[in-house]
């Protein structure tokens, strides 16, 4: 597959719509435009034209816009045809383009190939390219703002600034190693220790902000677990603000998981209602209970719901023993509205009424706390787990470099190597040092046409 052949795809989402776009990118598309429209197109001007089949039949009418390289999304020539958003119409326009450009090497685009070309042509760095997909996938206003902040280069600029400072420090180390006859006390002359301290402080700040960005992008997988009829489905409905799950007084109503995404202060939470945990001879219910335990195993957070009107029994004890120790568990006591006296719960628990709305605001705030969300923090950009991992790797190498800095100039070669590794970790975020396998994995997750 040639990276330089022209490519074409429908750029708008599948389905019917008012407007649909066919996008083409590649070298020297002026010739293709001449073939399609019988006339040249002025760059960066919208031309209202008929889109014709090879036999002259008018397929549609719309706007044709030609962007001449390098002033385009991909950095190549780009031709966009904007017509009506019917799937059949767009397929015919795309087919006509591929037919007209066949001898020019025009082919259908792969998923994410337009953005990959933008990256390869240095129109975007890798973090910005990922932000394109995140902006498309954003499910809340906060996530969309965070993705736009990343796309504008805010995150990349912070990473590049740290990277440049590490390079400068490493350059001084290498110079000292290359000219040992000068007998320079590097660590003292160039204030390596305070420079490292400042670098470490700024990197730690960036890591904290990246954690917020990961939470905003990926959210939390929250599983509602407990015995039958403790109010799991009622709580799901209350948090969602809609009747998502069926609620009846019959034990075992929920047989399979019900997943609903909600947003609290812009943070996405994937709430999973599950089958009630109990001993049963019902084959179908048993399958649902096994699936419940699988969901519990993969949860980021478990809400263990209990009915305050019923005393704890052996089943509650069994559930507590089997809950995974590595996963945070919040004990939630439901149906407090049915009590005559005030409920005295456990220290680290919440008392609520899913149906009456009591305690739900406190529960929402506790969910954000357990997610690690800091509402008072600086408005974050979106980040991915790979970004956070790379930042943490860089921090580890700076920590080792700091240990060497406490010694003397005899370990400057080790000091320089740790700086090199820290720099390498940071450049992996923006794509200056990234394997082809990782690039393929990132861009394959994009939609076709982007």
From Swiss-Prot:
Mg(2+) binds at residues 233, 254. The keyword GTP-binding applies. It comes from the Bacteria. Pfam families: MMR_HSR1, MnmE_helical, TrmE_N. CDD domains: trmE (cd04164), TrmE_N (cd14858). Its main location: cytoplasm. Residues 219-372 form the TrmE-type G domain. (6S)-5-formyl-5,6,7,8-tetrahydrofolate binds at residues 23, 80, 123, 450. It is found in: Cytoplasm. PROSITE patterns: G_TRME (PS51709). Homodimer. Heterotetramer of two MnmE and two MnmG subunits. This is tRNA modification GTPase MnmE. It comes from Bordetella parapertussis (strain 12822 / ATCC BAA-587 / NCTC 13253).
